[in-house]
Swiss-Prot record:
GO terms for molecular function: ATP binding; magnesium chelatase activity. It comes from Rhodobacter capsulatus (strain ATCC BAA-309 / NBRC 16581 / SB1003). Involved in bacteriochlorophyll pigment biosynthesis; introduces a magnesium ion into protoporphyrin IX to yield Mg-protoroporphyrin IX. The lineage of its organism: Bacteria, Pseudomonadati, Pseudomonadota, Alphaproteobacteria, Rhodobacterales. This is Magnesium-chelatase subunit H. Keywords: ATP-binding, Bacteriochlorophyll biosynthesis, Chlorophyll biosynthesis, Ligase, Nucleotide-binding, Photosynthesis. It catalyses: protoporphyrin IX + Mg(2+) + ATP + H2O = Mg-protoporphyrin IX + ADP + phosphate + 3 H(+). Belongs to the Mg-chelatase subunit H family. Its EC number is 6.6.1.1. The keyword ATP-binding applies. Pathway: Porphyrin-containing compound metabolism; bacteriochlorophyll biosynthesis (light-independent). CDD domains: CobN_like (cd10150).
Amino acid sequence: MSGTMPLPPHRPGGYNVVIITLDQHAAGPAARALPRLQHDFPDIHVSVHAAAEWSENPAKLAAAKAAVLGANIVVANLLFIDEHLQAILPEMTAVRDNLDAFVGMVADPQIVRLTKMGDLDMTKPASGPMALLKKLRGKSEPGAGSAEKQMSMLRTIPKMLKFIPGKAQDLRAWFLCMQYWLGGSEDNIESMVRYLVGRYADNRDWRGIKAAAPIDYPEVGLYHPDMPGRITTDPAKLPQPANPVATIGILMLRSYILAKDTAHYDAVIRELQAHGVAVLPAFAGGLDGRPAIEEFLHGKIDTLLSLSGFSLVGGPAYNDSDAAVETLKALDVPYVTAQPLEFQTLGQWRASGGGLGPVETTMLIALPEIDGATNPTVFAGRHDPAGCLTCARGCKPDPEAESHAMAPCPERIETLVDKVVRMAKLRRSKVAERKVGIVLYGFPPNAGAAGTAAYLSVFESLFNVMHAMKASGYQMGELPESVQELRDAVLCGPNTTHGQPAQIAARIPAAEFVARTKWLKDIEAAWGSTPGKHQTDGRDVFVLGRQFGNVFVGLQPVFGYEGDPMRLLFEKGFAPTHAFAAFYRWLREDFAADTLLHFGMHGALEFMPGKQAGMCESCWPDRLIGNLPNVYLYAANNPSEATLAKRRSNAVIVSHLTPPLAQSGLYKGLAEIKESLGRLRALPPDSPEREDLEALVREQAKGVNMDASDLSTLWEKLLETEGALITEGLHVVGRPMTAEARAEMLALMPENADRARADKLLQEEHEIAGLLHALDGRYVPPVPGGDLVRSPEILPTGRNIHAFDPFRMPTAFAIKDGAAQAARLLATHPTLPRSIALVLWGSDNIKSDGGPIGQALALMGARPRFDNYGRLAGAELIPLSELGRPRIDVVMTLSGIFRDLLPLQTKLLAEAAYLCASAENEPLAQNFIRANVLATMQDTGMDFETASLRVFSNAEGAYGSNVNTLVGSAGFGDEDELADAYEARKSFAYGRDGKSTKQVNLLQNVLSKVDLAYQNLESVELGVTTVDHYFDTLGGIARATKRAQGGKETPVYIGDQTRGAGTVRTLQDQIALETRARSLNPKFYEGLLKHGAEGVRQIEAQVTNTLGWSATTGQVEPWVYQRLSETFVLDDEMRERLASLNSAASSRMAQRLLEASDRNYWQPDPATLAALQAAADELEDRMEGVAAE
């Protein structure tokens, strides 16, 4: 960077002191101090430039660059983010030697090293001042107490140096500048400038002008806008309401208070007190909130609200979550963080589809979540000159406020305060008076899915939780005495009329709905006039569920578009149906819940349209949940979707275990083949029995549809099936694992796992305790999400799941492992592919610390670049000589959740692809990305930047391709309609700036060049036939690729990293393995059927998901449908059993098998087809109540 930036021919008129920092909090003090400075230093100019503004406002970056190039003195601090450093370092480096002084402090080492103040030159580490500095500093590492020690050192060292003559005085000046800056009041900012100019300006007449010593302010204190003096250390001096209903602790940044830039804090404090709560608004010097908590808040508050925007201990450079959690556990109150916008204006945020940007999301939301923070809410920012015009309130800058001052967002502050006060009141409420709304799900509709959730036996778990709640003091009346009675009470009975899947608990007349619904226009624009078409008799809107005293168990309405193919082709989502909106308003206002409990994974609320992070009042999840506290019971192995629920539905997560795992084992004909093969393998080569035994094996293999042409391969496939891990049934909250299941789980854990700890915790019940703790309005400690077998540290469950620190992803291990995965994939395919379609989910990346990201980078021949703090900063290319093969063109399709939770990684992948495409000096035969980009430009006329885009996902605020919904509802005709849906939903290309543009033509172009499609298995608990997300994403892109290539079949591979070194299989082999190890395995399906209706629904899902693979890839062998039909529909005893447990799911299963035949995915013989049709008719009649019992 050095020496290449041209200097301006002359500096602008006057003497220019330029301050480059992270935000604008010093702008006000500098502007107010300027007239007094100009009195002593005529023609002096002081400008403050905030790096946080540069990404969204290039003009601000240009102004900062010009200011640096025209500066006499530069002060640079709080610059830690690589994007900011790369933007400004060239100019700083170019002018540094010509400045009167360069002061780099509290910043990245690259900035600090530029410091030049008289004889102090930090580029010369051996110089006298630098040697002295090293001695004075000693060893220092970030962590608990480090900030307090550093501040003490900062005050002490200038006193020590004052009496050391010569060069030490410049070192003293550097420490004094830090004191001035960190005590950043108007007086101190003025004195800092006065001191620097008076000491270092080349104008000799100014050298004698003195500056006041730094003013010391309290390191911790209390602040209130309506208190004389505004700052105190005496809580008794704070104005408080009479008889407060609760007490809220507030954490603020001292820097804003000293700078008198407090309009945003003032608004929150006043709004809270308008609700009748007492406030303890505390601040601490530095970025460690613990001293303020210990001094003023411990044992005195009902909720803690942080307005700092950072994690509790740390800031833009690091966070110490262990120290934070220790403090918050002792405090034991809800911990809420609110976000002040620094990287965009309020108007920009409000107008954006995504909400917060990548760095904002990571720094302001993801890092505090690791501390256990919840309910992220934007509450303030700075205004554009025109104000925030896209909000109905039309807020404009305060004409009396300084141009760079923080401004409150009144609408968001009202929402924030409502939520915080509700939490505090919940904590103070009496259990016997507390009202709880428990939310169950019923997706997909008409499938016997009411009251089901992934991995969870809902009604067994609910039965245990409700009885525990009653024992804890909740008023619930007489509870059902059995699980079946509870299920019947909610889903059956005299009020299940009008074809509804559950009891009708309330009827809302259409006129009442119209009068009480704030966003009626939006709902009716999507779904027609009230009362709509869902959960209604044409007059009333129904709320489904059953009330048990102060606890209501309700069934969340479905999205509503499941059976409408045209709606499924829209690129974004829709407003909720009348019934969905009515459900949540009824819970809030009519039932008057004090808190909600969403029961299991997962509902539709958090997937409603709106911003990804940092929602506003136009976002549907925010509109629906309102100010209600929300406890969310969630599977411990899904941190990605749990995090989405946190950010978009006020959720405090309480984790639960997934079902126990076991080895599949062998059954029926499979066991017989293994026995015969075992005998054969034991025979000597010349044994006369070999020929007959080989014939027997081949006959046995034919009977179970296995290929016996290579007996060694057959043996390997049998062992693979036998050793495959399967889930045993569903998890029941409140029921610890059996000793047998526990032993099998422990045996599967890594050798280095603490099995004794895991064994102890698995015998204990933590989940109901965690739920009751959360419902009491207390702090739920955080825990990383993950699979129990691979990550035993998820124990104990009953805690608040969070994702991995995005700044650290991918880790060094993930990069190495990803490269190994990439090598396995390339070795599996017969030829070296030029282009690969790769599906990336948030969940498997979060649980593997970025393994699939590492795989994508390795295929392209790139790697992540990290800054001096170990934080992700971008991408760089691996030289071809080191890579040893050509760069593969990777078309990356991200899940909507990946896009939301890993925005930095989205930018990383986009930058990596761009760098590959830009490698002009590489031969095209060694760089398939560049070759394809140039070909695309030639064929289509696209510009280089567009043609280089390789990262695709949904539009902002949208999720999924809807291929799964089309399949699930049998809502497609020709399979190309699935490609239509995929392209409509997944054609948004994300660039190096993290922003998206719709690029259907580009997606079609890059897919036309794809040689294979690939995805990793997400979890040991899941298979590609277990959930519909796999064929929605991988199947969807395979179908779109087939169409883009004129009907040519695309090889599809699955990477199974769940055990050992990993395996790559063809999709056909993967489906066959899962069908044998899971779907047809009595050990698997009997484990499910122990849970009744919910088990039948899961078996049906396996069948539907198999159909989804046929529809999208055609890679399901016909025998799969034959065996499924024989096992679950054509067997009279089994058919009767399934129908008695769940008539809707069993009927749907038979219909799916017939649909597979109708669509020519298999061709059953006439007798089988006739028997299947008869069985389906019988099941349908039974479901409709026609057949005689």
